[in-house]
Amino acid sequence: MPTREIRHPLIRHKLGLMRRADISTKNFRELAQEVGALLTYEATQDLPLETYEIDGWCGKVQVEKIAGKKITVVPILRAGIGMLDGVLSLIPGAKVSAVGVARNEETLEAHTYLEKLAPDINQRLALIIDPMLATGGSMVATIDLLKKAGCKEIRAMVLVAAPEGIEVVEKAHPDVQIYTASIDQRLNEHGYIVPGLGDAGDKIFGTKQKDA
């Protein structure tokens, strides 16, 4: 499936604030949650609904709810945690399935070190969240893991994506829809997205940077 770049004015504005070199941990963290919530709105527009009856103030009324099992949100640790609250603000009943993936800084290859999945994940839509889609290694490893667990419908949301990473994921898993706030220019020689956001994990957790 082709990657969807969501160019909503609010997303563009907030993403511009996140790109500031002098942004504080507090502001980056809040903006990551806000953009995560806006992307969630876009990524869930086609969820199936079912009708049921309730007692309203003036009698019986037909209302709608999301059909079937609710979503499981899959943050890729550690940076994916920074988007989690924004997603859960719209889907508070979602299960959370955490996946830990680390990237070798020399080879840029990803390996999985943690998986805590919802026990019925094979019956749920899995929504992967990670601020950055750079080389695509972490995303592919996570999707591989979810499919091995029996997950049949998977979507991914990232704040910023590199064309190289998109190509890797789309080639490995053409059935997975990716939603992003921005498709950036390229990867640099160190595997970082340009212009990107810097190290999103460090900015979310306040490590290796001066807090403004």
Swiss-Prot record:
Pathway it works in: Pyrimidine metabolism; UMP biosynthesis via salvage pathway; UMP from uracil: step 1/1
Alphabetical keyword list: Allosteric enzyme, Glycosyltransferase, GTP-binding, Magnesium, Nucleotide-binding, Transferase
Domain of life: Bacteria
MF terms (GO), sorted A to Z: GTP binding; magnesium ion binding; uracil phosphoribosyltransferase activity
E.C. no: 2.4.2.9
Family: Belongs to the UPRTase family.
Function: Catalyzes the conversion of uracil and 5-phospho-alpha-D-ribose 1-diphosphate (PRPP) to UMP and diphosphate.
Annotated HAMAP family: Upp_B
Protein name per Swiss-Prot or TrEMBL: Uracil phosphoribosyltransferase
